[in-house]
Amino acid sequence: MSDKTPRKPTAFRLEQPARVSAASEQEEPRRPRAVKDLEQITPQADVFDLTDDEAAELEILDPAFEAPERKGWSLSRILFGALGILVSFAIGIWTEDLIRALFARADWLGWTALGVAMVALAAFAAIILRELVALRRLASVQHLRKDAADAAERDDMAAARKAVDALRTIAAGIPETAKGRQLLESLTDDIIDGRDLIRLAETEILRPLDREARTLVLNASKRVSIVTAISPRALVDIGYVIFESARLIRRLSQLYGGRPGTLGFIKFARRVIAHLAVTGTIAMGDSVMQQLVGHGLASRLSAKLGEGVVNGLMTARIGIAAMDVVRPFPFNAEKRPGIGDFIGDLARLNSDRNARK
């Protein structure tokens, strides 16, 4: 053990480190004072942006598509049907007389003509069958559109599932819809309201197609606008607008899974033109455009560039009408494109071209 006596407990005063208050570190607030000669930046409005009133007027000329009611036999249908039967009889009699004459001249000529006639008949039957299948597919798309709208309005889950299954069948060959179809297939056993199921199918399956369709419409409108601006004759403008519009209609129908044949394309184009005629925008010219945008847009461009914008907008209008006709579901969850979505791009395209000259 140690000889040292233990130290008695003693109280000690500890030296506390100096604390710097946060308030002292802060600088004193600057007294308010007047500042002069500030540099003011005034934003310039885009001359090609539409006001709310102008956009509303554009939307009035761009109503949604409503499928016309199917009418009975008309006089024009009876006329063309009777003429078609007469032409078929004439071709048949002419072919028979030709084969008989060839048999009278030489047997091998007659048999050759008969074989060629059989091949032509088989090819004609195959073409007719393909066209009938395409027409049936186009009709099924129109019926599906009505069924989907009715199921969403009544919030019918059974009808909605039936419409979604039909949509998945139509979009089965479209790679862009694979992810959406897989998602909807995984929800087969889930309980979902009919209206929500229709909106979900529209978002997951048709949204990628809508995005690509808008790109097709915008590119076609730009091409028409440029060709109109540089073409020397109005006949060239009209011809190219018709060509580009026909190609746009066919590409949109193929995009949404319609795949129309020749007769189906003609019927589809008639529906698009009828939709345009009902809205009264197929004859929209430069004077109408000046009234439409308050004498603003067309007056800011030269006459030729203004014609390019008008023809480009007409092509966009045809593309929007084609989307209305061929889209399997009506626009519900997704926003329907309008003319206002394309007018700014077309005007800027032509103004940039004018600035480079």
UniProtKB/Swiss-Prot annotation:
The annotated region (Disordered) lies at 1-36
NCBIfam families xrefs: hyp_HI0043
Q: Which family does it belong to?
A: Belongs to the UPF0283 family.
Name the UniProt record assigns to this protein? UPF0283 membrane protein BMEA_A1074
The way it spans or sits in the membrane comes to: Multi-pass membrane protein
InterPro entries recorded for this chain?
Answer: DUF697 (IPR021147), UPF0283 (IPR006507)
Q: Does the keyword Cell membrane apply?
A: yes
List, alphabetically, the Pfam families matched. DUF697
What is the organism lineage in this UniProt record? Answer: Bacteria, Pseudomonadati, Pseudomonadota, Alphaproteobacteria, Hyphomicrobiales
Keywords from the named record: Cell inner membrane, Cell membrane, Membrane, Transmembrane, Transmembrane helix
List where in the cell it is found: Cell inner membrane
Q: Which residues cross the membrane?
A: 78-98, 109-129
The keyword DNA-binding appears for this protein: no
Q: Which organism is it from?
A: Brucella melitensis biotype 2 (strain ATCC 23457)
Bias type Basic and acidic residues, positions: 27-36
Recorded hits in PANTHER family, A to Z, give: UPF0283 MEMBRANE PROTEIN YCJF
- Domain of life from the UniProt record: Bacteria
Gene Ontology CC, one term: plasma membrane
